[in-house]
Amino acid sequence: SKAIWGGLSYFLLPTSFCFRIFAAMMSDCSDKELELLQIIGSCAQKLNVPCYLVGGFVRDKLLQRGCKDLDFVCVGDGIALAHEVAKQFKPQPPVSYFKNFGTANIKHNEFEIEFVGARKESYASHSRKPEVESGTLEDDQKRRDFTINALAISLQKDDFGQLIDPFDGVNDLEAKIIRT
């Protein structure tokens, strides 16, 4: 079924379908990957920052491919979440951050982890440089390049693992289509 959220049609996948997708995706995750997702979800909950696994990792796991780059969108301060997550690792890795863009990176074992605050981008007619402001998950998904990179998995306690697919990216993956 479809729902309208902020003027955008979202495909709300039936719970049983979402569970199958999540189960298939998680069965392909290593113990280290699952532990990492649980740590990040717990830290996000502690900071009261909704957090979503997005982009290439979600896409690649659905395709049963390996991926060591994990991207997280936070509806709130992604840099603060990165610092909180880094505290959970021994030894504690440094956090590289770019305050102007609200992004932070951690290298932990073989993983490259990026946190970004959800953002909205707009462009002036005379510029290719975006004007950036804080946004919602929906805003962040709208700015993504391809439908398959707008896929998101919730890390919230109440709906952990819920797939959010606003642009029908799962069907595009199955059809082997790259669509903007």
Report each predicted region and the residues it spans.
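Catalytic cores of the polymerase beta-like nucleotidyltransferase superfamily
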Residues: R20-T180
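Compositionally biased, intrinsically disordered low-complexity segments enriched in Pro/Arg/Gln/His
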Residues: L12-L13
